[in-house]
Amino acid sequence: MTTVAFLPLSFPFLIFNFGQYIRIWAKNSDSDQWTCKSILTEGHTRTIRSVAWSPCGNYLASCSFDATICIWSKKDGDFECMATLEGHENEVKCVNWSSSGVYLASCSRDKSAWIWEFIEEDEEYECASVLTDHSQDVKHVVWSPKENALVSASYDNTIKIYKEVDDDWECSHTLIGHESTVWSLSFHSSGELFVSCGDDKVLKIWKCLKSGPSDVKWISICTIAGYHNRPIYDVDWSKLNNKIATACGDDAIRIFSIVRITISISNQLLFIAYYQAHNHDVNVVRWHPKVDNILASGSDDNCIKIWKVHSNN
């Protein structure tokens, strides 16, 4: 299992690969070479599953097969583990920060998603809610970029959306459409759409329809099928352009471009690139948050690759 996460404010990114260590890399200023700047060897006792930078770039969250979450603080270029969050009963599969940085979401094989709140004056994290709406493993959690709304994907083939109600969190929508495990999710920059990918080799684009403050529903407006030969393990929708990248079990990366956002988005979608990227399953893709043509991929072949996507694609 490999993961990558670009630092939100600059070009360095972090990677961990096949173990319990986190490696932080930076691009050399005078070349296209990358240098490992730091290796974080403490914190976890088993393989790390996911990592995420806070929006400010000063904190890093990691989660592991050891059922814990570590919060790392960056000071003077060095990182130290400032908190270990415990509560999940099994491996923690994904962590993700809200756009405000106040909330951190985690999900686990124990069928739950947790919301942790950062108490700034105490520099501590408290559990704000435990969400147990899924009937199987929760594979992925992601926050809307525009509001405190959380979305989760599960082995039970469903997607769930959570909102804060009276200082607690509850499931407001259950989305059904995938025929097998939903592996990953990624929002469009507007927060009005997101894309999901699944074991059924399908991408789906979902749109929020609002007819009033309390009258909200999510509908599937596009199903992208026939392009992938194996399960799609990850998807990332660039916040700088309308390109969607996928990581597939057939060792390949595919890129789609949305020409225009409409209710019939399938008529505005172009399949623009295919890369036989790795020698094994590709399990992660990430667009750079500040450079619109840079994409990173990670694979079970123990490699991370950085791609420059040309504008003519």
From Swiss-Prot:
Superkingdom per UniProt: Eukaryota
A biological-process GO annotation: protein maturation
SMART domains on file: WD40
A GO CC term assigned to this protein in UniProt: cytosolic [4Fe-4S] assembly targeting complex
Short name of one Pfam family: WD40
CDD domains: WD40 (cd00200)
Functional note: Essential component of the cytosolic iron-sulfur (Fe/S) protein assembly machinery. Required for the maturation of extramitochondrial Fe/S proteins.
The protein's name in its UniProt record: Probable cytosolic iron-sulfur protein assembly protein CIAO1 homolog
Species per Swiss-Prot/TrEMBL record: Trichoplax adhaerens
